[in-house]
């Protein structure tokens, strides 16, 4: 039976885009797993198989993420992009790695908007193969985007607030008034605190 899976990569970083991806297939006859549980090399190998399936994705830049956080919420932005992906789905049944604390609420919203059978589950990227496949697409594409940014701006680490290398990069950029507007999420508390500390 044809099913689709949707997942995102890069929800939490203070630097770089978020990627939402969807994969649709009748069956997945090769190994997949939650992208977070795989090494980079293993993800890349599986990506070659997964990318041969029907898939769609969106790369969402930091400015759009900031705008959503200011006006509504990050969840609201993900709802919008999940809806766009579902409307492009080749199948009637779509599994989503739930980004809302309330699974049934998100299911209801997306069912009402799309008319599709939407099933939202926490840890779906780990438990449902088609969502694992989507998580690999999203993660590898985001990793590729991060490498492109590093080739322009230098090595800023993982981009996550918990990464000391990322924090050093941000602090150095703020002190030196470097133009990193295109890559940083200014609405993140991490960035705001660093800016405040150097006013």
Curated annotation (Swiss-Prot):
One of its GO terms (biological process) is DNA replication, removal of RNA primer. Belongs to the RNase HII family. A divalent metal cation binds at residues 7-8, 97. HAMAP family: RNase_HII_A. The keyword Manganese applies. Its EC number is 3.1.26.4. PROSITE patterns: RNASE_H_2. InterPro entries: RNase_H2_suA, RNase_HII/HIII, RNase_HII/HIII_dom, RNase_HII_arc, RNase_HII_hlx-loop-hlx_cap_dom, RNaseH-like_sf, RNaseH_sf. It comes from Picrophilus torridus (strain ATCC 700027 / DSM 9790 / JCM 10055 / NBRC 100828 / KAW 2/3). It is found in: Cytoplasm. It is an enzyme of class 3 (hydrolase). Its cofactor is Mn(2+); Mg(2+). GO terms for molecular function: manganese ion binding; RNA binding; RNA-DNA hybrid ribonuclease activity. Endonuclease that specifically degrades the RNA of RNA-DNA hybrids. It catalyses: Endonucleolytic cleavage to 5'-phosphomonoester. It comes from the Archaea. The keyword Metal-binding applies. This is Ribonuclease HII. It holds the Pfam family RNase_HII. Residues 1-199 form the RNase H type-2 domain. One of its GO terms (cellular component) is cytoplasm. Keywords: Cytoplasm, Endonuclease, Hydrolase, Manganese, Metal-binding, Nuclease. Manganese or magnesium. Binds 1 divalent metal ion per monomer in the absence of substrate. May bind a second metal ion after substrate binding.
């Amino acid at each position: 039976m044809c099913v689709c899976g949707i997942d995102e990569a890069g929800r939490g970083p203070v630097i770089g885009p978020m990627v939402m991806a969807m994969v649709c297939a009748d069956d997945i006859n090769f190994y997949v797993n939650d992208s977070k549980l795989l090494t980079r090399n293993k993800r890349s190998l599986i990506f070659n198989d997964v990318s041969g399936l029907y898939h769609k994705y969106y790369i969402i830049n930091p400015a759009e993420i900031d705008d959503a956080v200011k006006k509504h919420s990050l969840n609201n932005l993900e709802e919008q992009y999940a809806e766009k992906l579902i409307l492009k789905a080749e199948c009637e049944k779509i599994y989503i790695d739930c980004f809302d604390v309330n699974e049934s609420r998100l299911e209801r919203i997306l069912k009402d908007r799309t008319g599709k059978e939407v099933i939202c589950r926490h840890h779906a990227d780990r438990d449902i193969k088609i969502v694992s496949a989507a998580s690999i697409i999203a993660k590898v594409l985001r990793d590729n985007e991060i490498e492109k940014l590093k080739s322009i701006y230098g090595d800023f680490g993982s981009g996550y607030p918990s990464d000391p290398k990322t924090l050093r990069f941000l602090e150095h950029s703020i002190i030196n008034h470097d133009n990193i507007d295109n890559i940083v999420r200014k609405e993140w508390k991490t960035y705001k605190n660093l800016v405040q500390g150097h006013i």
